[in-house]
UniProtKB/Swiss-Prot annotation:
Gene name in the database record: rpsP
UniProt GO molecular function: structural constituent of ribosome
Similarity remark: Belongs to the bacterial ribosomal protein bS16 family.
UniProt name for this protein: Small ribosomal subunit protein bS16
Pfam families: Ribosomal_S16
Gene Ontology CC entries for this record: cytoplasm; small ribosomal subunit
Keywords tagged on the record: Ribonucleoprotein, Ribosomal protein
GO biological process: translation
């Protein structure tokens, strides 16, 4: 099954997440199919906190991909802001 989920990057105690489309059997930070955005929970000032390609997310959901809980909340946040 294909899921849209967060993949952790960044330094120790300073997380930075890529929003990726991946097979649910692959490791959290492992192989992915497509990168559809990023999420920076520690963004301050003019730094961009969240970027998401909603067209690609919707295309993957139409193909049967499921959203993780956190990504689902982020998608709703982007849709509310738009």
């Amino acid at each position: 099954m294909v899921t849209i989920r967060l993949s952790r990057g960044g330094a120790k105690k300073r997380p930075f997440y890529q929003i990726v489309v991946a097979d649910s059997r692959s490791p959290r930070d492992g192989r992915f199919i497509e990168r559809v955005g990023f999420f920076n929970p520690l963004a301050t000032g003019k730094a961009e906190r969240l970027r998401l390609d909603l067209d690609r997310v919707n295309a993957w959901v139409e193909k049967g991909a499921s959203l993780s809980d956190r990504v689902s909340a982020l998608v709703k946040e982007v849709q509310k802001a738009a």
